[in-house]
Amino acid sequence: MDVTLPHHVVEDILERLPVKTLRKFKCVCSTWRSTIDSQRFKDRHMIHGQLLEDPDILLLGRWDPPSLSKNASLMTLTFDSSTMPFSFKIQTIPGKANFYKVTQSHSKSLKVVTVYDSNMEATGLVLYDMTQSERTFANFCLSFKNRETPTAYFPSLITI
């Protein structure tokens, strides 16, 4: 007896998987690959991940490239979805290079921050800081790029 799940059920299951697993599942079949590569899926996966657990946004303060070391100003902004409107706390992470990786490209205006989870695995989320006014968030595991600020995914959050 051959049992097949409807595609919308498969999509719903895939949405709940971590990025690292999705990358592997792109090889299962062409239907899964096209689903995972679709912009609609990428948007839903990101929103679903943020609804399941309180999302963290990485904030990197301005720094001088020569002093790019333990003294870099790095903080996480954690949202608490159990309160309405969202509350948040800011936690400074002094010298915790194992939670993030900052690289300076050949261009002095481009800085890259790679975010790692508590298991020291890359989350796939990368922040490119081109200038003060232009930032791009990308998740290369899902080929996701977004020039909007993270607040686009948090309608209740107002930036000052």
UniProtKB/Swiss-Prot annotation:
Output the PROSITE patterns linked to this UniProt entry. Answer: FBOX
Question: Where in this chain does the record put each F-box domain?
Answer: 1-44
UniProt xrefs under SUPFAM superfamilies? F-box domain (SSF81383)
InterPro entries the record matches: F-box-like_dom_sf, F-box_dom, SCF_F-box_component
The record's PANTHER family line, in alphabetical order, gives: BNACNNG10540D PROTEIN (PTHR31672), F-BOX PROTEIN CPR30-LIKE (PTHR31672:SF13)
This protein's name: F-box protein At1g15015
Query: What organism is the protein native to?
Result: Arabidopsis thaliana
The opening ranks of the lineage are:
Eukaryota, Viridiplantae, Streptophyta, Embryophyta, Tracheophyta
